[in-house]
Amino acid sequence: MGLTQRELEIIRERLGREPTAAELAFFTSHWSEHCSYKSTKMWLRELPGSAPWVVRGRGTDAPLVEVAHGLYVSFKIESHNHPSAVDPYNGAATGVGGIIRDILTVGATPIALLVNLHFGPPEDPHAKWIFSNVIKGISDYGNRVGVPVVGGETWFDEDFTYTPIVLATCVGVVEAEAVPKGYVEPGDYIVVAGLGADRSGLGGSAFASKTLEGGEDLGAIQVADPLMGKKLIDVVKEVSRCVKFIKDLGGGGLATALAELSHWFSLGVEFHLDKLHVRDASALPEELLISETQERLIFVISPRDLPCLEEALRKYEVPYSIPGRFVKSDRVLVMWKGVKIVDIPISLADGAPEILWPQEPYQPSDIPEIPEPPIDKAIDIVLSSPNVAKKESIYMRFDFDVGVRTAVKPGEGDAAVLKLYQRGQLGLVVKGDANPRYTFLDPRLGAANAFVKAYRNVAVVGGVPLAAVDSINVGSPERPQVYWRFVQAVQGLKEAATELEVPIVGGKVSLYNEYMGRPIKPTVAVVVLGKIDDVSKANRALWHDGDKIYIWGVTKGEVGGSEYLKRVHGILAGRPPSIDYAAEKEIVAVIQSWLGKISGATDVGLGGLITALAKMAINSGIGGEIDVCKAPAETTRLDYLLFSESNGRFIATGAEGPGVAIGEAYGEEFVVKCGGTLIYKRGVEELKRLMSL
């Protein structure tokens, strides 16, 4: 059933009776870990989320960040890991649909999607099956609703062979006056619009709150309908000014939606379930209550404004019903053909008891003594790694130009840049990052690294970071070491957000990411959003013929958890790179002072200095000659100089630039030296083939 004995006792005690079948379904769904966050919310409360430009932070379906006077941006991240493991096409597609609907709840028009994807090794048949279907699911849904996929990252690791991590972020924009009013009064109607309810997604939230053991029920997987998703986008554009509130009907179905609405507004709900429009007339009332049928929204509207909503719903042929209303009481009341089937106090409906699990620290092993390998072979191995490879074969399957807002396209720069036509040349810069190896070795420092990396990506392109959302994905919290890793990851995010002065305005926790008793490497993704005053000045990761090549920052001998250590030596050990927050903030100021004066820029991160330089050569189609030993460094080992993933660094190119000059761009060959010694030489076309996924 999904409820613990203690939870059942609390329910019986508070109700003063045995719960009905519908109430048991209600609590099983809404008190699941997926919906209630009962093992995590006490830690998440510590995350800083406020700033003068944050209009609405965590706590509702989507935040709002002011990027110009009267212009708001909303962005939100969602995971769909368990569904994507079992039915990768529909799991990924419904993940995209769900995050789009979250953005619709604030009246925003979705303008972009980003995806952070983690799969098993690309040569593994099962991982390849998941990979290809996830990509197709994202592509089909995004393309059909007209929202471009503008960026993301793809990671490959054996831990994700059977338990992929599938994260989708949606960005939307809305004028302040178009945001729904945000208040509710007794007598206001609850209108359910979209697909008729059926049995699809039954128990989806409970399914996402347990580990995978093989042979999972496909009935728990929702099915996407992008045509209806597009209709809902069109409806919201027309009615956001006349409705009071919009709520996504997602995880937990009506049970969660009604519990959250009554809790947010401290008002009772009276809901006649038999008046709900359905596609499956044989569905039981308790099934309708927790069904996670996709492409549905709840609109809260006053009776006098109802014609405004009904006109739009009819115009776009969106099915709807008016089964509920708000009342002046302290209860969630659900009726079925005149009979009460749910009668729960609001405080109990949304009051899953919190759980603090035991914690057990993990101590990573130190890096053993490793010989310095033949450098040219080591470079080839790292550059051909799927994790650092160019992902053109993936993003070319997405329509990233629909809406003609994408100023910096996938593969062109460190982050996506989106035009905001409402305010001239003003644009958004957005990027998501994660490194499961880092968060495995040191979850606190690893989570902070994910934040810093996304922050630096936004900064290097030319954005001023404003806000962040995060996604924490771990195994079962009942495992002391897993729960410790989760808590440490939250502390790392808290530290980074505080030091960088970038509030965390939303997030998602996904637990029980295990297969056959084996938890995944903890994976913390952070998406940072910033703004740029003039999108035409955004930096791309390239250079022009004759440009000088500069490096900013110091390379340290930091190869713990690095691509080099894993791919060349087969070792996962050490600690992630250290962080100097002041140095990271300085990068924002430096790049801002050079905007429009340099040809391009890219950060130095995964795969180290050699990878950053190689990507710029490929993007440009122009070679160059670089003396890496001119780069400021605190290591004497050449392999560490090339492959260290130290923070606080970026490459800039142009006639002049910030930092230390280490080379020049020209010709068709990528030539790397140390002093007068040649250490690596490849043609740009050969390099491109080497780094293709």
From Swiss-Prot:
One of its GO terms (molecular function) is phosphoribosylformylglycinamidine synthase activity. Mg(2+) 1 binds at E78. CDD domains: PurL_repeat1 (cd02203), PurL_repeat2 (cd02204). GO terms for cellular component: cytoplasm. It is found in: Cytoplasm. Pfam families: AIRS, AIRS_C, FGAR-AT_linker. It comes from the Archaea. The keyword Lyase does not apply. The active site is at H34, H80 (proton acceptor). InterPro entries: PRibForGlyAmidine_synth_PurL, PurL_linker, PurM-like_C_dom, PurM-like_C_sf, PurM-like_N, PurM-like_N_sf. Mg(2+) 2 binds at D102, D248. The keyword Ligase applies. Keywords: ATP-binding, Cytoplasm, Ligase, Magnesium, Metal-binding, Nucleotide-binding, Purine biosynthesis. Monomer. Part of the FGAM synthase complex composed of 1 PurL, 1 PurQ and 2 PurS subunits. Part of the phosphoribosylformylglycinamidine synthase complex involved in the purines biosynthetic pathway. Catalyzes the ATP-dependent conversion of formylglycinamide ribonucleotide (FGAR) and glutamine to yield formylglycinamidine ribonucleotide (FGAM) and glutamate. The FGAM synthase complex is composed of three subunits. PurQ produces an ammonia molecule by converting glutamine to glutamate. PurL transfers the ammonia molecule to FGAR to form FGAM in an ATP-dependent manner. Belongs to the FGAMS family. This is Phosphoribosylformylglycinamidine synthase subunit PurL. The lineage of its organism: Archaea, Thermoproteota, Thermoprotei, Thermoproteales, Thermoproteaceae.
